[in-house]
Design a protein with these regions (language model features):
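Catalytic-site microenvironment of enzymes
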Residues: 2-262
Length: 262
């Protein structure tokens, strides 16, 4: 009997059995390692959150002033020329939606060019911008033009958002106008939910990216409709002039970009 117990003990020891004291020490060491990893992750998150490449200080809304010169409007065709994105924005090279061979950027560019032509005819200076904006881009108003996509063909409607961190203090006023004028021009449904991705749009993020707007550029982003929705495609693909008109009317109505009456 004693021989049997001894043999079992030897087998357990040879197989790597450890007593309760050793096991507890290993568990404590594991927990300490996990805490260190968690602390490292928290430190990385704090550094990322507080990172600021803008050569500050960041202006306040009270310090806002319009750019010198004629009223300039920047219209960004979302995802257009995204393959040219620099390393800091390399993820742009691989996103964007499509519908049966029509890429999102094609719809965005068509709307941007139509709106730009109408605005230039009214006397505005207009820049049609690709996915990557010039560093520190300055304009009276910047509008990023995009289209949504969904696995559900029932998803329909448009969204407008202003930056979560708006140094101008004026972007949400412009966003409200665009929600109204775009809906009136297109007949599409306004979706009141603004996604975090829209509010934290990379072109707004001058703290993190070199290729971002100047903090004093009033900025908006519009998802003009769902390219995956037959209802919305009647506007954004089949009648982009209606989408363009909705954008133009907002520019005209916004007090900062309204042309003086002749």
């Amino acid at each position: 009997m004693k021989l049997t117990v001894l043999t079992a003990a030897v087998v357990l020891f040879a197989a790597g059995f450890v007593g309760p004291g050793v096991g507890m020490a290993a568990a404590q060491e594991q927990r300490a390692t996990e805490r260190d990893a968690s602390d490292d992750a928290s430190d990385r998150w704090r550094r990322w959150r507080n990172y600021n490449r803008y050569p500050g200080p960041i202006p306040t809304p009270e310090e806002w002033g319009a750019p010198a010169g004629p009223i300039r409007i920047g219209l960004q065709a979302g995802h257009w020329r995204a393959a040219e994105a620099p390393r800091e924005l390399r993820r742009l090279r691989y996103n964007g939606t499509q519908w049966q061979g029509t890429a999102e950027w094609e719809a965005n560019l068509a709307i941007a060019e139509l709106a730009g032509a109408q605005l230039e005819a009214l006397g505005y200076e207009v820049d049609i911008l690709p996915a990557v904006v010039p560093p520190g881009y300055r304009a009276h108003l910047f509008i990023a033009i995009h289209a949504d996509g969904s696995d559900s063909p029932a998803a329909s409607g448009y969204r407008v958002a202003s930056p979560r961190r708006d140094a101008t203090g004026r972007a949400e006023d412009a966003a409200r106008l665009l929600r109204d004028t775009y809906g009136a021009a297109t007949g599409l449904r306004n979706l009141p939910v603004q996604t975090r991705r829209m509010q934290n749009y990379y072109a707004f993020n001058y703290r993190r990216y070199e290729h971002a707007l100047h903090p004093m550029t009033i900025a908006l982003i519009i998802e003009t409709g769902f390219i995956t929705s037959a209802h919305d495609r009647r506007v954004i693909l089949d009648a982009p002039q209606r989408a363009a008109r909705g954008i133009v009317e907002a520019v005209k109505a916004f007090p900062i970009t309204a042309l003086p009456r002749r």
